[in-house]
């Protein structure tokens, strides 16, 4: 009898120990997963690159210009690899009209882009903010039977060590393609 009672006590102790160890294991793995999820942060560049324009193309000229500004801000304000630069360049070209893309070879476009980015970084300018025309300020018109839109965007540039910003207003012209997507046809500095 004594031996059977001892065996029961040993079994109960082993089961309790297994439950305690199992609960400890569960808690230690649970908090590790939460910490991993919290520590993964998406950079501004990665966030911009994750947008799938084939499935979720911006529906209005203003939204197209907003996404263009987000990419442009990444070019001048963020750190990125050479591969990410190429991906950003490809992503921004998805917003361009075919006619604009046809003006330069891909190689020339990338070289000009790299030169422009290097110059801005050398001059120590970043894009502090940007302001896009209100939707009510978009001027719609037709040219050669195609719908177009004209709107303005002001980039507020900040020089390192400076407290103020310099405004650079640009006028954009967008044209609707055969799929109903607004594409950037061109832009130029606007008179302020």
What does each model-identified segment do?
Residues 33-43, 150, 164-192:
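Short beta-strand edge/turn micro-motifs at domain boundaries
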Residues 9-10, 90, 94-95, 169:
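Short, charged low-complexity linear motifs
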Residues 114-158:
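Surface-exposed, charged secondary-structure patches
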Residues 21-27, 45-49, 102-110, 126-131, ...:
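Short low-complexity stretches enriched in small and charged residues
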Residues 43-122:
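Core segments of small alpha/beta cavity-forming domains
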